[in-house]
Amino acid sequence: MLTNMKKFFIFVLTLFFLNIVNAESYYIKDVNYKITGITRQYALETKVKIDKKKIFESEDELRKYLDDIVIQMLNTRTFDTVTYTCVIDDLQSTEDSISEKSNTENNDNTEESVLPQNTSNNTQTKNVTVTFFTNDTKHLIATPYPKYKSGDCLTAMIKVKDTNFAGSMENFTANVDFAVELNKDDEPESFKTGFSTDFGIPFKMGKLDTVWDNSIDFSYTFGDSSPEWNFGTGLKMALPFDKYSLIFNIKQSFIKNFDYDGEWKGTGEYRTYYKYNDSLYFVENVGFSIPIVIQEVNNWGRIYYTPFVNATYNWDFDGIHNDDTYLLGPGMTFGQTISTGRVNWIENFRNGINVSLTQIFGYNFNSYAFNPGITAELKLYKAFKNLGLSADLYAYAYMNGTDNFGSRLRGIRKDQYYDSDDPNIAILKSTDAQAAFVFNFDMPIKLFRIYWEKVPVINKIKASSKFNLEAQISPFLDIALFKNEETGTSFNIKDSFISGGIEGIVYPLRWKGIQVRGSLGIDLTRKMPVLKGKVNQDWRESCKSYEISIGIGLHY
């Protein structure tokens, strides 16, 4: 019996040592791209980074990593299909592999020169050459496009949107429009026409990953003495290293905006006009940040810690008015962010999490105002076969400042004021708060997917297949708890905003990066019998209790 046990242990130990002696590992030596479409290789390499320093302990581990890279590429919504092949070279020692690699690369500190490491002297390393095959999805759309936002504007436009501009995997938008601006009661207030465009062009500048950002917005309101505009251009430059990047931003804007000529504040007897004469001004903005990778998570991504600093200076030829708190400066913001996230698209539903926590310290050198604050956001997505669940939890608090959360609430007019006898409060918008917690919940449901080439009569139209689509309907609920200046309460459900409604979403199957969304939101605190009368609304002015919105893109 003892003899058999000894033989068994000797056999096991022999297998163990043979496994060590003959252990094989892998690292990605070369990556090639076979792109069908206009996507540029540099853009794809920048958007989805591939680790050429990591040692994989088995072929299975390597395959799982490459499968995850495919998912990341598909998550960009730039490609219809992504596949790969890999060629594994003959065995060679890790030491030889590293020596060969070091002879073919420059010896510097940038990401490309960091060599794969393996602590085992007996491990044999195989070099792997990977080739990715991608097919671009349709990315350019030009169409007549109505846009409507209750209490804001009704716009008829010709819209051009390109989600892969010049193969850059960056967005390009351009609009030529005619708009009817509406007041809070949805009555026409003014008529305007104009055009706008916004795009970024990534390129390599030495060792810097650079994006040239440009924006043009030009409009004329009938009856005004001159047009308005916002011309901006800037550079974002990143120097990448293995576990961090150095990012520098610079931007200049030239703006003509009559909103800063003066403004009305308050309602009723407290409505007052403040004259600034700051309609023509310039904006200088510089920023610096260091995203640092504090943890790598397999099949997930990276957890980042990012310290940052940003400075903004608004100026005009005769100086910014002392009462123009929107433009008065210069101002500087220091801060730090911890963030991570991974959201996978499963057909037209999302699955994953995005989370960020930011601490901010702001200072205005003109007003000497110090404004520390904190923001946090958690986005959750869960995909099922024919429906999805989505939630966005957003919170912020500032010591000496406010932020407007109205755009996050569908059904709540963001420009409504407090109904107060205190003139200092009556001039404040009720959706401007020093602290707030906003919760959005959506449940998109797949209604149908239609292929027009399979529909009788319509299938005789040659281009019918280009308009194949999936339609979804999504009930939603939005809630905002906040510091209420009129009632003096904080995060009290009885002094809150609650809205709900329904969205219709269309996904063009040939344009994966584009969604068309229509939304009807209702102010439930004023219209829903269960809530009406039970939630205090005396603190805000009376206005329309619904909001309709039509546009491109998802709410969050």
Where are these regions (language model features)?
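Residue-level signature of outer-membrane beta-barrel architecture
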Residues: 162-164, 201-203, 237-241, 288-294, ...
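Periplasmic polypeptide-binding modules associated with outer-membrane biogenesis and secretion
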Residues: 23-153, 159, 173-203, 219-228, ...
